[in-house]
Amino acid sequence: MRRTAISLTLASLLVSSASWAVVHPGVDLTDRYIVVLKKDASPNAAQQVLAAIENQRGAVLFRYQHTLQGFAVQMPLTALQGLQHRFPDIDYIEPDLAVQAMPRGGNKPNNGDSGTSTEPPQTTPWGIKRVGGFVDMSGDDARAWIIDTGIDDKHPDLNVDARSGRNFSRGKPNQTSDGNGHGTHVAGTVGAINNAMDVVGVAAGVTVVPVRVLDNAGSGTISGVIAGVDYVAEAAASGDCANLSLGAKGYSQALDTAIKTAADAGILFSIAAGNSADDASLYTPASTVHPNVYTVSAIDNNDNFAYFSNYGSDVEYAAPGVSVLSTKAGGGTVTYNGTSMAAPHMCGVLLVTRGQPSMSGYAEGDPDGNPDPIVHQ
């Protein structure tokens, strides 16, 4: 059932505290496709396909070399199908689709904004406490790769390695700042510094690396997400964690392959289950199954299963995803809701436990009747 024809509606998996939104439909990008070569295709064969695409005035948007061999291209499908007949090393072609982040109206900013703050110098959010508290990982070699909207590298509560970051969205390759806020919030839950200000993350002070695949409006493409995963596979080390708080309805074989290949190299993945109150197996990358890949549903502070959260057999753990306080782009903190917020709790625990998470209790009211264990250190 998971392997249905692709019909993608990628969105940053965050729910407004005022309106519990669901995924918005993606818009097909005319003449944009993902071309994947067979595993045993030689570098020379890949170069021949690339040259043929360029000779037919096709635009190569991304080239994938670390998790799979292939390209994201813009050219008519009929021309691509002609190339597929000419080059048997082409395994399959799938459409690239536009994606859009969810609205976030109604989220409440906290300290760091104008006016007198009533917050203590540093808050330990309820979600951090629920998964076992924070562990100081300042100076640790492990890193968290935030595949998202970028990260505010000037936020004083985050240890951001912007130099190792990359941009696969609009702008220059090294433009990884966050004009949206989603990625900065995710990064804070993973690793906000224990420094007597704002909040503290699960893996406090761990280095967070921005891999920008969504623009300032929260929009992106499946091809850009694959490019982000492909880069992480090249740059990350075994034991690092990549967080994917995004999702799409349907199945992308290329994205699934990219994640599994990176996971084979020891990179841990934490993936949001989705906010559509639906079976997570119908969404990508939530449906990716691998020992180093963890799909995460959301609970509230009473361990109740969040009614917006996706569910099902592809979900490994539940984590806090309602009224989650974390870092805000531009400084200070803000509260968000969504499985986007649950996944970084998991990522932090994976870093702290070196990929050996535990559990503490179960989500109450899981719609599939098989309650998800709540992740814990």
Annotate each PLM feature:
Residues 169-180, 211, 215, 305, ...:
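Short pre-catalytic strand/loop immediately N-terminal to key active-site residues, enriched for Gly-Thr
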Residues 23-30, 38-43, 47-123:
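Autoinhibitory propeptides
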Residues 61-68, 200-203, 210, 224, ...:
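C-terminal subdomain of the subtilisin-like protease fold in secreted/lumenal serine endopeptidases
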Residues 33-36, 72, 94, 143-146, ...:
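Structural recognition of the beta-strand scaffold that forms the well-ordered cores
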Residues 91, 108-207, 224-227, 234-240, ...:
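Active-site core segment of subtilase-fold serine proteases
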Residues 40-42, 68, 78-80, 97-101, ...:
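Solvent-exposed loop/turn segments at secondary-structure junctions
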Residues 143, 148, 267, 283-377:
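Extracellular S/T/G-rich loop segment that most often corresponds to the catalytic His/Ser-adjacent loop
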Residues 16-18:
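N-terminal signal peptide c-region/cleavage motif recognized by signal peptidases
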